[in-house]
Amino acid sequence: MRVCFRSSVHPELMAEYKQRHAAVWPEMLKALKDAGWNNYSLFLAPDGQLIGYLECEDYKAAQARMAVTEVNGRWQAEMATLFANSDLPPDQGFEIVEEVFNLEDQLAAADSVKEPYAVTDAVTGAHINTDSAAHEYQKEQA
């Protein structure tokens, strides 16, 4: 599954946030991978808006696996002061963002359609096979 989330970094602490993420602890990287976090990226807007993206089999399970690691506890404690909404630990204060479009999913769905695309004539209500309509138009133009 694909997961997108957002949070907020204090704008005055963005440079420190970037610096810490430029050299994430190797044991934290390994823990994320071992917990099932794949293709994980963070994006930081100029106003402190943080967008995260990851792929995993089961987000709640991947998050739960991270929650029990010692390194995650240390990392979250180090990062907590950088977040604007610091009532919760940083890894629990994410707002999940709904995915509304994915190119590959829609292309795969379109490729799996076996029947020609059909539309309904607005005047007569008749079903029109667009492949047949295109063929008839080509014959008329010849």
Language-model-detected regions and their locations in the chain:
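Short amphipathic alpha-helical segments
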Residues: 13-38
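A broad, low-specificity signal marking well-ordered, structured residues that form hydrophobic/aromatic
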Residues: 3, 50, 95
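An amphipathic, aromatic/His-enriched active-site/gating alpha helix that lines ligand/cofactor pockets
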Residues: 35, 56-94
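Short, glycine- and small/hydrophobic-rich beta-strand elements in well-ordered beta-sheets
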Residues: 29-51, 55-57
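Short glycine-/aliphatic-rich beta-strand segments at the starts of folded cytosolic domains
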Residues: 2-16
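Short, polar/acidic, helix-capping and beta-turn segments at strand->helix junctions
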Residues: 14, 43-44, 55-60, 101, ...
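Hydrophobic pocket/interface hotspot
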Residues: 5, 17, 21, 52
